[in-house]
Curated annotation (Swiss-Prot):
Belongs to the eIF-3 subunit J family. HAMAP family: eIF3j (MF_03009). The modification Phosphothreonine is found at T107. The lineage of its organism: Eukaryota, Metazoa, Chordata, Craniata, Vertebrata. This is Eukaryotic translation initiation factor 3 subunit J. Residues 68-133 form a coiled coil.
Length: 256
């Protein structure tokens, strides 16, 4: 009985230790089960990589607005720098205008030319600053849109300018206006160029004088009447009056 009991105990122990691992049994062996879990771990790693890709895309999307903001800052800085330069230029022009004149260095004509030039620069600077401040469009048409550089360009520019100016030729102030205009625009010219312009105006003046003389001569010819004209007619009238007077005097002498 004891031997039987011992045999049963050994068999129970054997049965206890011979029980197979259900996990390994289901997995089809230790090695296969381990590979399966390792595969699942790799899937989890791939999922983590996908998250990393999403994070990188988000970071790129966040970086782009920062680039745009920096570009806007650069543009704003450029505008501010340009405004500072314009302001500095205006101050320099204003300072030069307020400086006392130096007659020992510049002639009166040169002083006038310098003042006109500085005034023009200041006006242009003020205009450009106003346009930039208020966002005015620089699109212009006609004579204001021209920027002549060649001979043909200046010829066309001259025609448009002539048409613009001569529309006021009926004004009482037109001649004085032209005199001042020609003097002002010729101040910066060289002597040789001034001589050419003077000669051209002299020739024009001579032609106008000839035309005026011819016109007066034609008017005189139209007023002449055949047979002595107006003077002859007056002479005849006086003769008739004298004949009448002579007859009256003869009658008086006969009466005496």
């Amino acid at each position: 009985m004891a031997a039987a009991a011992a045999g049963d105990s050994d068999s129970w122990d054997a049965d206890t230790f011979s029980v197979e691992d259900p996990v390994r049994k289901v997995g089809g062996g230790g090695t296969a089960g381990g590979d399966r879990w390792e595969g699942e771990d790799e899937d989890e790693d791939v999922k983590d990589n996908w998250d990393d890709d999403d994070d990188e895309k988000k970071e790129e999307a966040e970086v782009k607005p920062e680039v745009k903001i920096s570009e806007k800052k650069k543009i704003a800085e450029k505008i501010k720098e340009k405004e500072r330069q314009q302001k500095k230029r205006q101050e320099e022009i204003k300072k030069r205008l307020e400086e006392p004149e130096e007659p020992k260095v510049l002639t009166p004509e040169e002083q006038l030319a310098d003042k006109l030039r500085l005034k023009k620069l200041q006006e242009e600077s003020d205009l450009e600053l106003a346009k930039e401040t208020f966002g005015v469009n620089n699109t212009v048409y006609g004579i204001d849109a021209m920027n002549p550089s060649s001979r043909d360009d200046f010829t066309e520019f001259g025609k448009l300018l002539k048409d613009k100016i001569t529309q006021y030729e009926k004004s009482l102030y037109y001649a004085n206006f032209l005199e001042a205009l020609v003097r002002d625009v010729c101040i910066s010219l060289e002597i040789d160029d001034l001589k050419k312009i003077t000669n051209s105006l002299t020739v024009l003046c001579s032609e106008k004088q000839k035309q005026e003389k011819q016109s007066k001569a034609k008017k005189k010819k139209k007023g002449v009447v055949p047979g002595g004209g107006l003077k002859a007619t007056m002479k005849d009238d006086l003769a008739d009056y004298g004949g009448y007077d002579g007859g009256y005097a003869q009658d008086y002498e006969d009466f005496m």
